[in-house]
Amino acid sequence: MHEKNTVNQDEIEKFDRLAKEWWNPKGKFAPLHKFNPIRQEYLIDHIAQNFNLNVKDESPFKNLNIIDIGCGGGLLCEPLSRMGANVTGIDAAKTNIEVAKIHMKESGLKINYLNTKPENISNQKFDVVLCMEIIEHVKDVDFFIESCLNLLKPGGVIFFATINKTLKSFALAIVGAEYILRWLPIGTHEWSKFISPNDIINKVSKFYLKHIETKGVVFNPLFNKWKLSDDTDVNYMCYFKKD
């Protein structure tokens, strides 16, 4: 009998090969560097709102424990650490964690980076759980969601960012981004693994969390930047609160 786990070994090996590119804004992860400011702003605003914090204060997140699941090279962990949060970043790809640790030291920050999976640290609890651009890469979505929710404290919030399962997302996120524009390596995403907002809401709601918001994120080619939108056909973020 095989023990359940959320790891897709092919996905891990794929990102292992790319990990050294994480902190190169003009490298293979350039699209993520371009996408990062809008998701970072969204997270900071809504974390502050949920915990009634003023982002203009010095170290406004100093009493918060935050975990970023599938943290990669630490693109979200570092800015949250700078805001005073106690940040844990976990990733199943060891190379990602090594890259994140190196950059953390170069940045003079203190972040708890672990090469592990959410189901392996269920004894730890956090105020904020981040599942950003990770759910479309896991093997067992239901088990992954359950494992992530197990890490959340009462009163805490969990965020998901992923890609909707629509014809538009196939055209833009795969054909456009991978084959035409070459923003991402071919094979980065599989349309069959994309998931709709309603699917996430239904899966999370089984655990009696309250759905707070779903927001789309679209790319504006005129300004060469991402912006928030009511259009959730391709990229979107959603978050939930545990009472």
Sequence positions of predicted segments:
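Acceptor-substrate binding/catalytic loop of class I
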Residues: 162, 182-199
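Core SAM-dependent methyltransferase catalytic element
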Residues: 225-243
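Conserved SAM-binding loop
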Residues: 53-169, 197-200, 238-242
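Short, flexible, mixed-charge acidic loops at enzyme active sites
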Residues: 169-179
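N-terminal, positively charged/glycine-rich alpha-helical extensions of SAM-dependent methyltransferases
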Residues: 1-29, 33
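Conserved hydrophobic residues forming the short capping helix/wall of the S-adenosyl-L-methionine
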Residues: 47, 51, 104, 204
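Conserved alpha-helix/loop element of class I SAM-dependent methyltransferases that forms part
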Residues: 34-62
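Short alpha-helix
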Residues: 191-208, 214
